[in-house]
Design a protein with these regions (language model features):
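A short beta-strand motif that forms the metal-chelation/ATP-contact edge
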Residues: 42-47, 121-124, 176-178, 242-257
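Conserved N-proximal alpha/beta basic substrate-recognition cap immediately N-terminal to
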Residues: 9-104
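Protein kinase-like catalytic core scaffold
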Residues: 121, 162, 184-185, 232, ...
Length: 293
C-alpha cells in the first residue's frame, strides 16, 4: 500500500508528514500527474491542494483526485471537501445549512447592488488566504469604496468577493487542527500590534494551547464533518459570550510542532489519517460483500 499527499507545491507541513511514518507505512508527496501515474486500487491519497497565490481559484488537480477515487484509491480530502473548504461562499452555505455559527455572508458580483449594512463588514476574495486582500469596512461608504477598488482585480472579475459580517476583533483567534474527526492540535494566533487580522503572514504570532477548549473542539469537529474533510484547519473567533464562531476553513492547512505541546502533532495526524483510510476501506469491502451475498 502506498500513502500519498497530493499537492502542487512543496510545503514544510508535507515534508514533516512524510517523515512521520506509521508503523511500516510512510507517506510520500506526489503532484496530481504523478499520482495518476503511480497510485492504484488499495492505495491512499490525501488531497492537499491549496488556493492559488493569485487568489483567483484553486490549484489544478481536483480532476486527478476524482480519477483516483474512480480507480479504487481511497481519497481523503476529496474534491468536494477541498472545494467546500477553499470556496468561502460554499463554506458559508454549508455551515448555515448545518446551523454552525458563521458570520452573515453576502456575495458581491459585478453589477450587483451593494447590500444595506447593519454593522461593520469584511471584504475578502472568494478563494483567499494569508490575509491578502482582506479589507475592513466600518460603514456603507467604506464598503462602496472598497468594492470599487477591487473590481479591477483578476480574482474579483472571476469570482466576485465575499462580504461578511465582522466578528468584533479581540486580538486573537484559535486555529484547531482536525484529523479524522479528532482534534490533534491547536494554536492561538495573536494579531500584530495595530493589526486586526491574526494571520501569521501579516505579523501575527502563534501561541501554543496546552488544553484546547472543549466547546471549540466540538465546533471544529462539526465543521470538518459538515464539509466531509479528513484533515482541515478550522479558524475560530470568540463571540464575546463564551462561544465560538467559525471564521474560515483551510483544506491545505499548514501547521508546526507548536500546535500540540502534549504529543507529536505530525505523528498523531499521520496515524489518524491512516486509521481513517483503513476504516473507510473496511466499510467499502463490507458493502461490496453485502452486494455479492
Amino acid at each position: 500500500m502506498r500513502l500519498a499527499l497530493i499537492a502542487c507545491r512543496p510545503s514544510p507541513t508535507n515534508v514533516a508528514l512524510v517523515r512521520a511514518s506509521f508503523g511500516d507505512l510512510s507517506w510520500e508527496t506526489l503532484d496530481p500527474h504523478e499520482a495518476l501515474a503511480n497510485l492504484r486500487s488499495g492505495d491512499v491519497a490525501v488531497g492537499r491542494l491549496d488556493v492559488l497565490p493569485t487568489l483567483d481559484g484553486m490549484d489544478d488537480g481536483l480532476w486527478a483526485l476524482g480519477a483516483l477515487a474512480a480507480r479504487g484509491v481511497t481519497v481523503l480530502n476529496d474534491p468536494a471537501a477541498l472545494l467546500a473548504a477553499h470556496d468561502k461562499l460554499l463554506t458559508a452555505r454549508i455551515l448555515r445549512r448545518r446551523e454552525i455559527a458563521h458570520p452573515w455572508t453576502w456575495h458581491s458580483r459585478p453589477g450587483r447592488p451593494v447590500p444595506r449594512l447593519l454593522g461593520p463588514v469584511v471584504v475578502k476574495p472568494r478563494f483567499g488566504s494569508w490575509g491578502h486582500e482582506v479589507h475592513r469596512c466600518d460603514d456603507a461608504d467604506a464598503l462602496r469604496r472598497t468594492l470599487e477598488r477591487v473590481q479591477g482585480a483578476a480574482w474579483y472579475r472571476r469570482h466576485g468577493a465575499i462580504v461578511q459580517e465582522l466578528v468584533h476583533p479581540q486580538g486573537y483567534d484559535l486555529r484547531v487542527l482536525v484529523a479524522a474527526r479528532r482534534v490533534v492540535g491547536a494554536v492561538h494566533r495573536v494579531a500584530a500590534p495595530g493589526e486586526w487580522r491574526t494571520n501569521v503572514a501579516l505579523g501575527g504570532v502563534r501561541r501554543p494551547v496546552t488544553d484546547p477548549p472543549l466547546e471549540a473542539g466540538l465546533v471544529a469537529i462539526e465543521a470538518a464533518r459538515a464539509i466531509g474533510a479528513s484533515l482541515v484547519g478550522v479558524d475560530l473567533l470568540p463571540d464575546g459570550f463564551g462561544g465560538w464562531v467559525v471564521a474560515e476553513l483551510n483544506g491545505a492547512v499548514e501547521f508546526t510542532h507548536e500546535y500540540a505541546a502534549w504529543h507529536d502533532v505530525f505523528a498523531e495526524t499521520s496515524g489518524a489519517l491512516v486509521r481513517e483510510a483503513f476504516d473507510r476501506q473496511g466499510r467499502d469491502l463490507a458493502l461490496e460483500r453485502s452486494r455479492l451475498a
